[in-house]
């Protein structure tokens, strides 16, 4: 059972509510001393060791503060023992594998088991050039160190050919089978990426290495900027240059690909690659087949290593070297619609294409999941006002979501190209393990390419307070509004879960399951409401156009527009609406947005209508059979009741004897019947007596046989026989 309090058991002791209340009771004249430059102080620890009182402060208060500091140190040691920081894990890694080069630094470690005669539970440590495993079961230590250059094959396996939680690592002389992974796919991708870099003799820069560490362990590592080549975590809030954002996105694909594979939509990061890469899980299990599919990264190495190495992972960043195109040009980062759904209105194609390219280069989609990718028949400015202003649409949408205490601050900023605002509201929570509601603080940052640009990008960071493990994570969303035409705009919404501290695998899976469920429900509801607003807007525009056209016909009747006598025609507000082309790129919006010009039943497939008719006919037949069965049962019951009534009526209406002769005849018949019955009973009794006699005779013979065959019971000589 998980702790449902806002502060979980894995949070640091200094973040508990009781600890903060005690800190507030400390006198303001005694600030904690600053640590020396050469020392590091963990969060929640207190290095104050002064014993002297401060003038004007009661001695009881100083004694209480010293006791509190002592208790906080005990809690800090207890917390460090249960949840060691990255610094402690790295020190343990260097102690356990002291023969490795000193330049090797721990990137991530996973809990797993090595399959041998028995399962050896331990931890798998990954560095830039080595894979290490350590297990200690009742002083029985097992240590394995594998250099990545020596690995010839890397496969995903199944424990007992059923549970997909194992990885097999093969070298020229050995095979190691690691199982019981909590995040097998993520670990496999990271090992595969490091293996590729080792075979290609590529090294990670300090920035890339520390970004991987922060992705795996969070931002609180127990380190400072004075520890060797430590690099602080980079905040991906869209303020960096395109080159920096691209570099970091390429690295973050490693840790986020596990979540992207479970998404129904194709990953936006994967779609930005210059070539189509094979599926990693399929290609890595069959390395030779993967070598035939992708030949862009072959090197002259060992046969097995080169064949396995040439498989490019899904999250591979594009190479800077010029390569020959393998086939037709793939879609750009924003052209995710199939060819039959591409827009036919090319009046503003050049400007919209340039704007899409600029926005895609500046702020690409987040590396989590693409939740909305739809084209609406609404202008970009109007769509922005509907979503990011105090509009009736937003108010109605928040009321439908049952959000309360909504506070929208106005946009503030130096220019129209970069603005910021903060939203606060309370959301309902249906999770039985948590509270019924939670307060939310959402920070929105708006970016534009220019003051007159039609499109914009809004980054949103949502912090939910009052829920379990609130200090571990927060959610980030990116809204990208692109103006395609005067009355058309594309809305792309991507989301990801960002971690401040790395939780346990079980807690992380619980956080991701609940968070993604709520995020997907919210944005699917938003997409449906936008589709309804779009339909209402198109209907109102069609009515206005028809009213204007009828007025023109009344004034100029000879100039009435007719097409071969089919009736008056009027221009549609949009060519795509007239042709019935649905330009939405999301699967849910295709089912939730019917075409405007279609009839009430035109959007229903004929197969669905046929199935409905068959089901209705089957139900009618079943009802008729049930009625017939009920009638048959009722008829049988009524017939039986009728027969019984007739028999009783016949007895009731029978004629009784009137004279003495008739009574004498009846008495004679009764005596005769009685004598017959007595004779029958006598025969039955006589037969019973005969059977009893036979049984008695048999039992007597059996008793005689038993008495003769049994030996005498008294085998000991009697005492009086010895004297005779």
Curated annotation (Swiss-Prot):
One of its GO terms (cellular component) is cytosol. Residues 1-66, 256-336, 560-579 are annotated as: Disordered. Residues 563-575 have a biased composition (Basic and acidic residues). It holds the Pfam family GRAM. GO terms for biological process: autophagy; cellular response to cholesterol; intracellular sterol transport. The modification Phosphoserine is found at residues 263, 267, 271, 415. InterPro entries: Cholesterol_transport, GRAM, PH-like_dom_sf, VASt. It is a single-pass membrane protein. The chain crosses the membrane at residues 610-630. Residues 1-18, 326-336 have a biased composition (Low complexity). The keyword Transmembrane applies. The keyword Phosphoprotein applies. Disulfide bonds: none annotated. Its main location: endoplasmic reticulum. Expressed in liver. Induction: Up-regulated in hepatocellular carcinoma tissues. One of its GO terms (molecular function) is cholesterol transfer activity. Residues 57-66, 300-312 have a biased composition (Polar residues). Keywords: Autophagy, Cell membrane, Cytoplasmic vesicle, Endoplasmic reticulum, Lipid transport, Lipid-binding, Membrane, Phosphoprotein, Transmembrane, Transmembrane helix, Transport. Residues 91-158 form the GRAM domain. It is found in: Endoplasmic reticulum membrane; Cell membrane; Cytoplasmic vesicle, Autophagosome. GRAM domain binds phosphatidylserine in the PM and mediates protein recruitment to endoplasmic reticulum-plasma membrane contact sites (EPCS) in response to excess cholesterol in the PM. VASt (VAD1 Analog of StAR-related lipid transfer) domain, also known as ASTER (Greek for star) domain is a sterol-binding domain. Cholesterol transporter that mediates non-vesicular transport of cholesterol from the plasma membrane (PM) to the endoplasmic reticulum (ER). Contains unique domains for binding cholesterol and the PM, thereby serving as a molecular bridge for the transfer of cholesterol from the PM to the ER. Plays a crucial role in cholesterol homeostasis and has the unique ability to localize to the PM based on the level of membrane cholesterol. This is Protein Aster-A. It comes from Homo sapiens. The lineage of its organism: Eukaryota, Metazoa, Chordata, Craniata, Vertebrata.
């Amino acid at each position: 059972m998980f702790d449902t309090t806002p502060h979980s058991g894995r949070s640091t002791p200094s973040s508990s509510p009781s600890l903060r209340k005690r800190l507030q009771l400390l006198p303001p004249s005694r600030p904690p001393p600053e640590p020396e430059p050469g020392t590091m102080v963990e969060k929640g620890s207190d290095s104050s060791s002064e014993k002297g009182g401060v003038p004007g402060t009661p001695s009881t208060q100083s004694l209480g503060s010293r006791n509190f500091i002592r208790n906080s140190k005990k809690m800090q040691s207890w917390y460090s023992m249960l949840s060691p920081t990255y610094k402690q894990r790295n020190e343990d890694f260097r102690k356990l594998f002291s023969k490795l080069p000193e330049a090797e630094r721990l990137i991530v470690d996973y809990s797993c088991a090595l399959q041998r005669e028995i399962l050896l539970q331990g931890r798998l440590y990954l560095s830039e050039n080595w894979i290490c495993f350590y297990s200690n079961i009742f002083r029985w230590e097992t240590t394995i160190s594998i250099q990545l250059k020596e690995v010839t094959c890397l496969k995903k396996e199944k424990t007992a050919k059923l549970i997909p939680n194992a990885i097999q690592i093969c070298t020229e002389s050995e095979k190691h089978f690691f199982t019981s992974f909590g995040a097998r796919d993520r670990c496999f991708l990271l090992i595969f990426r490091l293996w590729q870099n080792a075979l290609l003799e590529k090294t990670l820069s300090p920035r890339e290495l520390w970004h991987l560490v922060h992705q795996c362990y969070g931002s609180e590592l127990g380190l400072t900027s004075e520890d060797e080549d430590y690099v602080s975590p980079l905040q991906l809030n869209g303020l960096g240059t395109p080159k920096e954002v691209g570099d970091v996105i390429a690295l973050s694909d490693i840790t986020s690909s596990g979540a992207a594979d479970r998404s129904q939509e194709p990953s936006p990061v994967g779609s930005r690659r210059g070539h189509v890469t094979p599926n990693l899980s399929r290609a890595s299990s069959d390395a030779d087949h993967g070598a035939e599919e992708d030949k862009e990264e072959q090197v002259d190495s060992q046969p097995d290593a080169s064949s396995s190495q040439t498989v490019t992972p899904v999250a591979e960043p594009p190479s800077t070297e010029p390569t020959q195109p393998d086939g037709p040009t793939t879609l750009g980062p924003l052209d995710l619609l199939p060819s039959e759904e591409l827009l036919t209105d090319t009046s503003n194609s050049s400007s919209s294409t340039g704007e899409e390219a600029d926005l895609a280069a500046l702020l690409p989609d987040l590396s989590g999941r693409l939740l909305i990718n739809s084209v609406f028949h609404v202008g970009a400015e109007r769509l922005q006002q509907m979503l990011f202003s105090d509009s009736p649409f937003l108010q109605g949408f928040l009321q439908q979501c049952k959000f309360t205490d909504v506070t929208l601050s106005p946009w503030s900023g130096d220019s129209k190209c970069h603005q910021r605002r903060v939203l606060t509201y309370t959301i309902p929570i249906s999770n039985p393990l948590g509270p019924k509601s939670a307060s939310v603080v959402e920070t929105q940052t708006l970016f534009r390419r220019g003051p007159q640009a039609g499109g914009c990008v809004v980054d949103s960071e949502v912090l939910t307070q009052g829920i379990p493990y609130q200090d571990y994570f927060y959610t980030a969303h990116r809204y990208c509004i692109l103006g395609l035409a005067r009355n058309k705009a594309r809305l792309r919404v991507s989301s990801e879960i960002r971690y401040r501290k790395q939780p346990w695998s079980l807690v992380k899976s619980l956080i991701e399951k609940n968070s993604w469920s709520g995020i997907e429900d919210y944005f699917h509801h938003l997409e449906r409401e936008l589709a309804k607003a779009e339909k209402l807007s198109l209907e109102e525009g069609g009515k206005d156009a028809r009213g204007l056209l009828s007025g023109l016909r009344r004034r100029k009747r000879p100039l009435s527009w007719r097409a071969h006598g089919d009736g008056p025609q009027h221009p549609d507000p949009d060519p795509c609406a007239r042709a019935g082309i649905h330009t939405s790129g999301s699967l849910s919006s295709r089912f939730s947005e019917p075409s405007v010009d279609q009839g009430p039943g035109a959007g229903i497939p004929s197969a669905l209508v046929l199935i409905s008719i068959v089901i209705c006919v089957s139900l009618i037949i079943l009802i008729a059979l049930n009625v017939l069965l009920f009638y048959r049962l009722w008829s049988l019951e009524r017939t039986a009741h009728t027969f019984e009534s007739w028999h009783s009526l016949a007895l009731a209406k029978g004629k009784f004897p009137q004279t003495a002769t008739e009574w004498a005849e009846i008495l004679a018949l009764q005596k005769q019947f009685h004598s017959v019955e007595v004779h029958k009973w006598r025969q039955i009794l006589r037969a019973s007596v005969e059977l009893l006699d036979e049984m008695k005779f048999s039992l007597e013979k059996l008793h005689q046989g038993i008495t003769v065959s049994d030996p005498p019971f008294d085998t000991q000589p009697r005492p009086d026989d010895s004297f005779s």
